[in-house]
Amino acid sequence: MLYPSIDLLMQKVDSKYKLVTVAAKRARQLQENEELTIKNPVSKKFVGQALEEIAADHIELVEEK
């Protein structure tokens, strides 16, 4: 079973494409030594940690126009 589940993540983000984009951008920030906002992440990979942050509502999604 994957954590966090896609169902939980889709409740936080209205589009799976936006979810992928946000997770990738956040993973890139984490790779560049940005501080992690959750304690004791389940995943050891940056993308997994980014998804955990999204699931925990630690990432605020802002629409750019």
From Swiss-Prot:
Example GO biological process: DNA-templated transcription
Q: State the source organism's domain of life.
A: Bacteria
The record ties this protein, via SUPFAM superfamilies, to:
RPB6/omega subunit-like (SSF63562)
Keyword Transferase carried by entry: yes
Q: What class of enzyme is it?
A: transferase
Database matches in SMART domains: RNA_pol_Rpb6 (SM01409)
EC number(s) per entry: 2.7.7.6
Recorded hits in Gene3D superfamilies, A to Z, give: 3.90.940.10
Swiss-Prot/TrEMBL keywords? DNA-directed RNA polymerase, Nucleotidyltransferase, Transcription, Transferase
Entry GO CC: DNA-directed RNA polymerase complex
> Listed GO molecular functions?
DNA binding; DNA-directed RNA polymerase activity
Catalyses which reaction(s): RNA(n) + a ribonucleoside 5'-triphosphate = RNA(n+1) + diphosphate
Q: Which InterPro entries match?
A: DNA-dir_RNA_pol_omega (IPR003716), Pol_omega/Rpo6/RPB6 (IPR006110), RPB6/omega-like_sf (IPR036161)
Stored PANTHER family = DNA-DIRECTED RNA POLYMERASE SUBUNIT OMEGA
Q: Which family does it belong to?
A: Belongs to the RNA polymerase subunit omega family.
Q: How does it assemble?
A: The RNAP catalytic core consists of 2 alpha, 1 beta, 1 beta' and 1 omega subunit. When a sigma factor is associated with the core the holoenzyme is formed, which can initiate transcription.
**Protein's job:** Promotes RNA polymerase assembly. Latches the N- and C-terminal regions of the beta' subunit thereby facilitating its interaction with the beta and alpha subunits.
Family annotation (NCBIfam families):
rpoZ
Descriptive protein name = DNA-directed RNA polymerase subunit omega
